[in-house]
Protein backbone atom coordinates (compact mmCIF):
# COMPACT_ATOMS: atom_id res chain seq x y z
CA UNK A 1 0.00 0.00 0.00
CA UNK A 2 1.62 3.20 -1.12
CA UNK A 3 -1.05 5.73 -0.20
CA UNK A 4 -3.89 4.76 2.13
CA UNK A 5 -6.58 7.19 3.11
CA UNK A 6 -7.15 7.83 6.79
CA UNK A 7 -10.73 6.72 6.49
CA UNK A 8 -9.71 3.27 5.20
CA UNK A 9 -7.09 3.00 7.94
CA UNK A 10 -9.77 3.59 10.57
CA UNK A 11 -11.95 0.91 9.01
CA UNK A 12 -9.08 -1.59 9.03
CA UNK A 13 -8.33 -0.82 12.69
CA UNK A 14 -11.96 -1.37 13.52
CA UNK A 15 -11.92 -4.75 11.73
CA UNK A 16 -8.78 -5.81 13.59
CA UNK A 17 -10.50 -5.05 16.90
CA UNK A 18 -13.38 -7.40 16.13
CA UNK A 19 -13.68 -10.55 18.20
CA UNK A 20 -13.38 -13.93 16.40
CA UNK A 21 -17.14 -14.27 16.02
CA UNK A 22 -17.43 -10.84 14.41
CA UNK A 23 -14.56 -11.57 12.07
CA UNK A 24 -16.46 -14.53 10.66
CA UNK A 25 -19.20 -12.16 9.51
CA UNK A 26 -16.96 -9.40 8.19
CA UNK A 27 -14.11 -9.52 5.71
CA UNK A 28 -12.24 -6.77 4.00
CA UNK A 29 -10.33 -6.66 0.77
CA UNK A 30 -8.14 -3.72 -0.14
CA UNK A 31 -7.51 -2.81 -3.78
CA UNK A 32 -5.37 0.07 -4.94
CA UNK A 33 -4.60 1.67 -8.28
CA UNK A 34 -3.20 5.01 -9.41
CA UNK A 35 -6.34 7.05 -8.84
CA UNK A 36 -8.86 5.27 -6.61
CA UNK A 37 -8.86 3.09 -3.53
CA UNK A 38 -11.74 0.84 -2.63
CA UNK A 39 -12.67 -1.15 0.42
CA UNK A 40 -14.86 -4.21 -0.15
CA UNK A 41 -17.00 -5.35 2.77
CA UNK A 42 -18.49 -8.86 2.83
CA UNK A 43 -21.31 -8.57 5.35
CA UNK A 44 -23.17 -11.70 6.31
CA UNK A 45 -26.95 -11.48 6.33
CA UNK A 46 -28.16 -13.73 9.20
CA UNK A 47 -31.69 -13.98 7.79
CA UNK A 48 -30.75 -15.21 4.31
CA UNK A 49 -27.46 -16.86 5.34
CA UNK A 50 -25.56 -15.35 2.47
CA UNK A 51 -23.17 -12.45 1.81
CA UNK A 52 -23.84 -9.05 0.36
CA UNK A 53 -20.99 -7.32 -1.36
CA UNK A 54 -20.69 -3.62 -0.52
CA UNK A 55 -18.08 -1.75 -2.48
CA UNK A 56 -17.41 1.71 -1.10
CA UNK A 57 -15.41 3.78 -3.55
CA UNK A 58 -13.18 6.24 -1.74
CA UNK A 59 -11.36 8.94 -3.64
CA UNK A 60 -7.65 8.99 -2.91
CA UNK A 61 -6.85 12.10 -0.86
CA UNK A 62 -4.31 13.31 1.63
CA UNK A 63 -4.58 14.75 5.14
CA UNK A 64 -6.11 18.02 3.94
CA UNK A 65 -9.25 16.09 2.89
CA UNK A 66 -9.70 18.57 0.08
CA UNK A 67 -11.81 16.26 -2.10
CA UNK A 68 -14.05 13.27 -1.52
CA UNK A 69 -16.48 11.27 -3.61
CA UNK A 70 -18.92 11.42 -0.68
CA UNK A 71 -19.28 15.16 -1.04
CA UNK A 72 -18.69 16.31 -4.59
CA UNK A 73 -19.07 19.80 -5.93
CA UNK A 74 -22.71 19.20 -6.84
CA UNK A 75 -23.56 18.18 -3.29
CA UNK A 76 -21.73 21.21 -1.90
CA UNK A 77 -23.67 23.52 -4.20
CA UNK A 78 -26.94 21.85 -3.20
CA UNK A 79 -26.17 22.37 0.47
CA UNK A 80 -25.33 26.01 -0.14
CA UNK A 81 -28.64 26.52 -1.97
CA UNK A 82 -30.60 24.80 0.78
CA UNK A 83 -28.83 26.89 3.40
CA UNK A 84 -29.55 30.12 1.52
CA UNK A 85 -33.16 29.07 1.04
CA UNK A 86 -33.47 28.46 4.77
CA UNK A 87 -32.36 31.99 5.61
CA UNK A 88 -34.43 33.56 2.86
CA UNK A 89 -37.65 31.67 3.60
CA UNK A 90 -37.76 29.83 6.93
CA UNK A 91 -36.05 32.62 8.88
CA UNK A 92 -38.31 35.27 7.42
CA UNK A 93 -41.44 33.16 7.85
CA UNK A 94 -40.48 32.31 11.41
CA UNK A 95 -40.19 35.93 12.50
CA UNK A 96 -42.78 37.37 10.15
CA UNK A 97 -42.78 40.86 8.72
CA UNK A 98 -40.68 42.98 11.08
CA UNK A 99 -42.14 46.26 9.84
CA UNK A 100 -45.68 45.02 10.47
CA UNK A 101 -44.69 43.94 13.98
CA UNK A 102 -43.23 47.38 14.68
CA UNK A 103 -46.28 49.15 13.32
CA UNK A 104 -48.60 47.01 15.43
CA UNK A 105 -46.48 47.77 18.52
CA UNK A 106 -46.53 51.57 18.14
CA UNK A 107 -48.87 53.00 20.82
CA UNK A 108 -49.68 56.23 19.00
CA UNK A 109 -51.06 57.50 15.77
CA UNK A 110 -49.41 56.43 12.54
CA UNK A 111 -50.37 58.81 9.79
CA UNK A 112 -49.61 57.99 6.20
CA UNK A 113 -48.66 61.28 4.69
CA UNK A 114 -50.62 61.34 1.54
CA UNK A 115 -53.63 62.53 3.49
CA UNK A 116 -55.03 59.21 4.68
CA UNK A 117 -54.49 57.42 7.97
CA UNK A 118 -54.01 53.91 6.60
CA UNK A 119 -50.64 52.22 7.26
CA UNK A 120 -49.92 49.04 5.26
CA UNK A 121 -51.01 46.66 8.03
CA UNK A 122 -54.24 48.29 9.20
CA UNK A 123 -56.42 51.38 9.09
CA UNK A 124 -55.94 53.71 12.04
CA UNK A 125 -58.41 56.57 12.36
CA UNK A 126 -57.51 59.90 13.88
CA UNK A 127 -60.05 59.56 16.69
CA UNK A 128 -58.57 56.23 17.79
CA UNK A 129 -55.34 57.78 19.12
CA UNK A 130 -55.39 61.57 19.45
CA UNK A 131 -52.36 63.62 18.55
CA UNK A 132 -52.77 65.69 21.73
CA UNK A 133 -52.84 63.72 24.96
CA UNK A 134 -51.73 63.66 28.60
CA UNK A 135 -48.71 61.70 29.77
CA UNK A 136 -47.85 60.51 33.26
CA UNK A 137 -44.04 60.51 33.36
CA UNK A 138 -42.07 57.69 34.92
CA UNK A 139 -40.94 58.69 38.40
CA UNK A 140 -38.12 57.57 40.69
CA UNK A 141 -38.09 58.75 44.32
CA UNK A 142 -35.46 58.14 46.98
CA UNK A 143 -34.22 59.78 50.18
CA UNK A 144 -30.63 60.55 51.22
CA UNK A 145 -29.74 62.32 54.47
CA UNK A 146 -33.19 63.85 55.00
CA UNK A 147 -33.32 65.05 51.40
CA UNK A 148 -35.98 63.68 49.04
CA UNK A 149 -34.79 63.20 45.45
CA UNK A 150 -37.35 62.93 42.66
CA UNK A 151 -36.52 62.05 39.05
CA UNK A 152 -39.06 62.23 36.22
CA UNK A 153 -38.63 61.30 32.56
CA UNK A 154 -40.07 64.11 30.43
CA UNK A 155 -38.09 63.92 27.21
CA UNK A 156 -38.96 66.18 24.31
CA UNK A 157 -39.83 69.32 26.27
CA UNK A 158 -38.05 72.62 26.76
CA UNK A 159 -36.99 73.55 30.28
CA UNK A 160 -38.95 76.81 30.02
CA UNK A 161 -42.13 74.75 29.59
CA UNK A 162 -41.66 72.88 32.88
CA UNK A 163 -43.61 74.09 35.92
CA UNK A 164 -43.05 72.78 39.46
CA UNK A 165 -45.31 73.79 42.36
CA UNK A 166 -45.41 72.66 46.00
CA UNK A 167 -48.50 73.84 47.86
CA UNK A 168 -50.13 72.30 50.93
CA UNK A 169 -47.78 69.31 50.79
CA UNK A 170 -48.85 68.56 47.21
CA UNK A 171 -46.13 68.60 44.56
CA UNK A 172 -47.41 69.22 41.02
CA UNK A 173 -45.19 68.85 37.94
CA UNK A 174 -46.48 70.01 34.56
CA UNK A 175 -44.48 70.02 31.32
CA UNK A 176 -45.83 70.81 27.88
CA UNK A 177 -44.62 68.82 24.90
CA UNK A 178 -44.90 71.10 21.89
CA UNK A 179 -44.82 70.41 18.20
CA UNK A 180 -41.39 70.61 16.58
CA UNK A 181 -42.80 72.20 13.44
CA UNK A 182 -45.28 74.90 14.61
CA UNK A 183 -44.41 77.42 11.89
CA UNK A 184 -44.46 74.93 9.01
CA UNK A 185 -47.39 72.75 10.06
CA UNK A 186 -49.64 74.03 7.27
CA UNK A 187 -46.89 74.22 4.65
CA UNK A 188 -44.93 70.96 4.73
CA UNK A 189 -45.95 67.58 3.37
CA UNK A 190 -45.51 64.85 5.99
CA UNK A 191 -44.34 61.45 4.85
CA UNK A 192 -45.22 59.84 8.17
CA UNK A 193 -46.52 61.13 11.51
CA UNK A 194 -45.96 58.98 14.61
CA UNK A 195 -45.36 61.59 17.30
CA UNK A 196 -47.94 62.90 19.75
CA UNK A 197 -47.88 66.25 21.49
CA UNK A 198 -49.43 67.01 24.84
CA UNK A 199 -48.76 67.58 28.52
CA UNK A 200 -46.74 65.68 31.10
CA UNK A 201 -48.41 65.86 34.50
CA UNK A 202 -47.61 64.19 37.81
CA UNK A 203 -49.02 64.94 41.27
CA UNK A 204 -47.29 63.71 44.44
CA UNK A 205 -48.68 64.20 47.94
CA UNK A 206 -46.49 64.30 51.05
CA UNK A 207 -47.56 63.80 54.64
CA UNK A 208 -48.36 67.00 56.47
CA UNK A 209 -45.37 68.89 57.88
CA UNK A 210 -42.95 66.55 56.16
CA UNK A 211 -41.10 68.71 53.62
CA UNK A 212 -39.90 72.29 53.64
CA UNK A 213 -41.24 73.97 50.50
CA UNK A 214 -38.67 76.77 50.77
CA UNK A 215 -35.87 74.29 50.04
CA UNK A 216 -37.27 72.86 46.82
CA UNK A 217 -34.91 72.89 43.82
CA UNK A 218 -35.30 71.63 40.27
CA UNK A 219 -33.08 71.19 37.24
CA UNK A 220 -33.66 69.65 33.82
CA UNK A 221 -30.87 67.56 32.28
CA UNK A 222 -31.08 65.42 29.11
CA UNK A 223 -34.80 64.80 29.34
CA UNK A 224 -34.73 64.08 33.09
CA UNK A 225 -36.30 66.47 35.61
CA UNK A 226 -34.43 66.35 38.94
CA UNK A 227 -36.21 67.74 42.02
CA UNK A 228 -34.87 67.91 45.57
CA UNK A 229 -36.66 69.03 48.71
CA UNK A 230 -35.53 68.88 52.34
CA UNK A 231 -37.48 67.21 55.08
CA UNK A 232 -38.11 68.93 58.38
CA UNK A 233 -35.63 67.85 61.03
Swiss-Prot record:
Keyword field contains Ubl conjugation: no
Domain sHSP: 129-233
Keyword Membrane: no
Keyword terms, alphabetized: Stress response
Induction and repression of expression: Up-regulated by phagocytic stimuli.
Any Pfam family hit: HSP20
Superkingdom, natural source: Eukaryota
Family according to the record: Belongs to the small heat shock protein (HSP20) family.
Name used for this protein in its record: Small heat shock protein hspF
Protein species of origin: Dictyostelium discoideum
